[in-house]
Each structure stands twice: as C-alpha cells, then as structure tokens.
C-alpha cells in the first residue's frame, strides 16, 4: 500500500508527499479517511484525483468533495488506479454521484463491474462510418433536425422554454420504441431541477431505463468537472458490452467548461482568452471524442448549452460548436404562441439533413416547410402594418399554409399528459414526412388551422378538422 501525507491544503487543491519512487500516476485516485469530523459532524472520507507532479515526490490533487476538516500530516492512500464507477444493469433506475456512489437512499449498488472514468476514445477501425438517423417520434426534430445515431446534438434555450420536457420525452421514446437506455448527467445545475426531474421521471415510468449522475452547483469544481465523464463511462458500458443504442444527456455542458476553468486557476495555470483554461479545447475534445458510434452500438448525446450573455463567439460555446452534429434552438417567441415543443424551425440545423442520408423526399419536404415559414416571416411586417387584405392571392395562400405548418409542428408529449390532458403521440418519420408534404401540396387548404394544433399524424388533423367544421 502506497501511503503519503498531506503537506498543503488550498481550498479544493491538496498537495500530498509520497515516499521516494512511489509517486502516483496522473489521474490516480487518492483516498483520505479519518475518524476526525468536519464542521458538519461527518467523518472525513475524501477522494482526490492527481492533477500535477510538482517534483520532490509531491503531487497536486483536486478534491471530489469538500476538504473541510483536512489538516497537514493526514495519511493519504494511493489506490493505484483512476476513479472508477459501477456500471451495468444494477445502475438503472439509480441516482449516483461523481464516484458512482448512490445518493437516492435506496442502498448500495451491487455490481461486479467497474469502469475507470478516464478511457481512450474508440479506435478509428472500431468506429461506425454509417450515417443513420435516430427516430425520436418528435415531428419537428425528425423532419428538420434529424438526430445522427451516435452523434452530438446541442440544445440551446433560455429558462422555461421546455428543454427539460424535450429531454424527458426523448428518454421516454427511446426507452419505449427502441428499448434503449438513457444516462442523464447533471453537471453544475440546480439541485432543485435534478430533484424535479427525478420525481417527474419516476411518475412517467421511465426511470427504470435510466441512470442519473449528479454533480450540482454546490459541489466543488473537481466533482463538476468529472461528473460528465462518470455519465459517459456508464453509457460506454451499455454501448460496448451490451451493444445498446444509448442516449447520454448532459445538462449543462457549459458548466463542465466553467468547472475546468476554476480547477485550472487553482492549479496555477496561466489563463487564456476570456479567463478560460489553456486546456479548454483538449478537455472538450477528450470527452466529446468518446461519444460516438462503434460497430457494436452507439452513444448519442444531447447536450444543453448555456450561452453566456448570448454571445455565441464566447470560447466555451464556440469550442462546443466544433463537436456538434446538430443544433436544436428553442425559441421564446414560439413558446409564447403556445406551440410546444418550441423548436425554432429556421434557426435549428443538422449535419445529416442531406438527401444522401435522409433521402430526397425527406430533404425536399423539410426545405419546402422552411421555405414557406421563411416567406411567412418576411410577410409578417406587411401584415402587421397593412393587414392580410393587402397581400396577393399567392401570399395569402402561403400565410395560410405556413400557419397550418407552424401548428402541425406542435405535438402532445407523453411526459406532459398530466399537464395538457392530451395523450402523447409518437409519430414515425414516414408519417411525419407524408403529413407535411400533404399540407405543402395544398391537400388540406379547406381545413381550419386549429385542426393542426397538438395532434400526431395528419389523419388526426383531418378528423379534428371535420369535427370543428361540424
């Protein structure tokens, strides 16, 4: 057993000296346990991660929980391996922290397998080169922002526009339609939101297909920096060992960067642009490159991205953009119209909205919808000033169809049934394309626009329209 002792404590950074020739490797986990109590009366049981070798047999480590109660001279034991977390089926339906320890009060997780949180990305020969769409059953996403299986999607939105509801619906649909597994990593967000999500998912009945990992705002930066990797290693197990199509949700990827910035400053590194860490691109790349499809299975990630001061050129979101295959932009203006999911059909983009991947029919329909909605956007100023009467007959038709398309992009969600009173709908991609194409072709010009609001397939809209017309 390799035992050192604490020589310096600066906040969450702890320097530990080991005997000559026994200095632990970078990323090794160090344990400090003591019967001495901290300020809250808890016995000290602390895990730290080696971040730097300082020379003179001393290492600088970053703590994964509070360093309250630590004193110089305390014994520190090198575990000889990186931080590991339990993986596999026993973790489903459970809530864990950065170290894989349960925090849901349901007892220990009994798993015979543990994965290190630091793992290399899959080699190129094992990666799948096939571009394939992941069917989500959400019309606006499947049509305009198709998700790449094994890809990375950014979810951009302010407070209260429905990020969490979309996340929950995706978890629900993947679990029920594909038998898929989801991992939710809460990185540096509000504890209340994590609690709400846990309760809502329990009520919606999707928790047994999900593992949740939390490192919240009140945790030290070391935990917030590593919790995304804990979530990722849980997802990698299901991909590599069970061949599952796994969904990884990270909320919020900006907090991962923010925690990295705090740790970097504490380690004494020279800051780079806007005060961020000089290793920003490396840290982001090491994590994002592990999120990919292999010949065995896939890890598809949906990452909520907070944009500081709405500045997309800020180094944190700008570095994230480089890795994304698609961006789903949630708009407050659309939410105010009562159209949910409040996805902006003109701002959202996907790399695989390409006729070679999704097929020509899908591509032409999606572009047709965007063209009509763009024209409607251009005409809105004229309508506001002069009214509909001043438009040409062609433009009146465009406006009528655009308003129907806009409403048809809304959809009742399974996880929101308790609030909307409407049963949720899963719409297959073929049905989605056919419905929008029929509206573009003018087959439903006779129906009122309310018929298209909060329905699933086009047949439901026609039926609702007939009822409205009496």
Swiss-Prot record:
Keywords: ATP synthesis, ATP-binding, Cell membrane, CF(1), Hydrogen ion transport, Ion transport, Membrane, Nucleotide-binding, Translocase, Transport. Gene3D superfamilies: 2.40.10.170, Bovine Mitochondrial F1-atpase, Atp Synthase Beta Chain, Chain D, domain 3, P-loop containing nucleotide triphosphate hydrolases. It catalyses: ATP + H2O + 4 H(+)(in) = ADP + phosphate + 5 H(+)(out). The gene is atpD. It is found in: Cell membrane. It is an enzyme of class 7 (translocase). SUPFAM superfamilies: C-terminal domain of alpha and beta subunits of F1 ATP synthase, N-terminal domain of alpha and beta subunits of F1 ATP synthase, P-loop containing nucleoside triphosphate hydrolases. It comes from Pelotomaculum thermopropionicum (strain DSM 13744 / JCM 10971 / SI). The keyword Transmembrane does not apply. F-type ATPases have 2 components, CF(1) - the catalytic core - and CF(0) - the membrane proton channel. CF(1) has five subunits: alpha(3), beta(3), gamma(1), delta(1), epsilon(1). CF(0) has three main subunits: a(1), b(2) and c(9-12). The alpha and beta chains form an alternating ring which encloses part of the gamma chain. CF(1) is attached to CF(0) by a central stalk formed by the gamma and epsilon chains, while a peripheral stalk is formed by the delta and b chains. It is a peripheral membrane protein. Produces ATP from ADP in the presence of a proton gradient across the membrane. The catalytic sites are hosted primarily by the beta subunits. Belongs to the ATPase alpha/beta chains family. ATP binds at residues 157-164. CDD domains: ATP-synt_F1_beta_C (cd18110), ATP-synt_F1_beta_N (cd18115), F1-ATPase_beta_CD (cd01133). One of its GO terms (cellular component) is proton-transporting ATP synthase complex. Its EC number is 7.1.2.2. The keyword Nucleotide-binding applies. Its main location: membrane. PROSITE patterns: ATPASE_ALPHA_BETA (PS00152). Pfam families: ATP-synt_ab (PF00006), ATP-synt_ab_N (PF02874), ATP-synt_VA_C (PF22919). This is ATP synthase subunit beta.
């Amino acid at each position: 057993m390799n035992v050192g002792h604490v020589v310096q404590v600066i906040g969450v950074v702890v320097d530990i000296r080991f005997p000559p020739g026994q200095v632990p490797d970078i990323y090794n986990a160090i344990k400090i346990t003591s019967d001495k109590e901290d300020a809250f009366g808890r016995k000290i049981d602390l895990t730290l991660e080696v971040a730097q070798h300082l020379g003179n047999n001393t290492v600088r480590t970053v703590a994964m929980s509070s360093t309250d109660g630590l004193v110089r001279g305390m014994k520190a034991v090198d575990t000889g391996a990186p931080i590991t977390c339990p993986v596999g089926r026993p973790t489903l339906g459970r809530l864990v922290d950065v170290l894989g320890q349960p925090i849901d009060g349901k007892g220990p997780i009994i798993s015979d397998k543990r994965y290190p949180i630091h793992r290399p990305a899959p080699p190129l020969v094992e990666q799948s080169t096939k571009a394939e769409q992941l069917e989500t059953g959400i019309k606006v996403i499947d049509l305009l922002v198709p998700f790449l299986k094994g890809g990375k999607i950014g979810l951009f939105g302010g407070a209260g526009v429905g990020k969490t509801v979309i996340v929950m619906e995706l978890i629900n649909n993947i679990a029920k339609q594909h038998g898929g597994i989801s991992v939710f990593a809460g990185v540096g967000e509000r504890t209340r939101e994590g609690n709400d999500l846990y309760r809502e998912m329990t009520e919606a009945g999707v928790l047994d297909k999900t593992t949740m990992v939390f490192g919240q705002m009140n945790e030290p930066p070391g935990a917030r920096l590593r919790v995304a990797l804990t979530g990722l290693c849980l997802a990698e197990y299901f991909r590599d060992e069970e061949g599952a199509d796994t969904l990884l949700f990270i909320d919020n990827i900006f907090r991962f960067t923010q925690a990295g910035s705090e740790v970097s400053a504490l380690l004494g590194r020279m800051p780079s642009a806007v005060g961020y860490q000089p290793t920003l691109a490396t840290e982001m790349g090491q994590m994002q490159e592990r999120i990919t499809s292999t010949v065995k299975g896939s890890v598809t990630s949906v990452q909520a991205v907070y944009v500081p001061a709405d500045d997309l050129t800020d180094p944190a979101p700008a570095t994230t953009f480089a890795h994304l295959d698609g961006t789903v932009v949630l708009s407050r203006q659309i939410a105010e119209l009562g159209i949910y999911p409040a996805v902006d059909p003109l701002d959202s983009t996907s790399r695989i909205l390409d006729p070679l991947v999704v097929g020509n029919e899908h591509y032409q329909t999606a572009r047709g919808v965007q063209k009509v909605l763009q024209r409607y956007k251009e005409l809105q100023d004229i309508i506001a000033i002069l009214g509909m009467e001043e438009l040409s007959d062609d433009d009146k038709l465009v406006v009528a169809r655009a308003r129907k398309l806009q409403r048809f992009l809304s959809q009742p969600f399974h996880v929101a049934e308790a609030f909307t009173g409407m049963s949720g709908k899963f719409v297959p991609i073929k049905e989605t394309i056919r419905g929008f194409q029929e509206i573009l072709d003018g087959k439903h010009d006779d129906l009122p626009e309310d018929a298209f609001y909060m329905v699933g397939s086009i047949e439901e809209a026609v039926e609702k329209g007939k009822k409205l017309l009496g």
